């Protein structure tokens, strides 16, 4: 049987992401883009080969608190300044927006 399934949580946490802030004030997280691009490419291949996957969810769209390391690692497509609560789209957020808009790479 080809059981329907979905990926409920996929993502990566990075410590010290503020070191990747560029002169325009947003985080250039190419490592996260590469991570998601690779995972989505393999998922696409699996679907083409008959996998019955009907959904894919990233871990979180916004930097969040983790039971394991609080706010030490950052996970989202949107950065959160913990002092001001200002939210800033990361490079990966701009990338995933385009992937979603175009329904693929």
Which stretches of residues belong to each language-model region?
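Non-catalytic scaffold segments within catalytic domains of secreted glycoside hydrolases
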Residues: 1-105
């Amino acid at each position: 049987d080809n059981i329907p399934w979905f990926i409920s949580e996929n993502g990566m946490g990075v410590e010290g992401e503020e070191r990747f802030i560029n002169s325009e004030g947003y985080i250039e997280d190419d490592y996260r883009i590469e991570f998601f691009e690779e995972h989505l490419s393999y998922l696409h291949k699996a679907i083409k080969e008959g996998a019955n996957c009907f959904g894919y969810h990233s871990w979180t769209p916004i930097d969040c608190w983790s039971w394991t390391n609080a706010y030490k690692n950052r996970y989202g497509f949107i950065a959160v300044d913990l002092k001001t609560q200002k939210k800033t789209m990361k490079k990966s957020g701009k990338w995933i927006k385009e992937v979603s808009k175009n329904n693929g790479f």
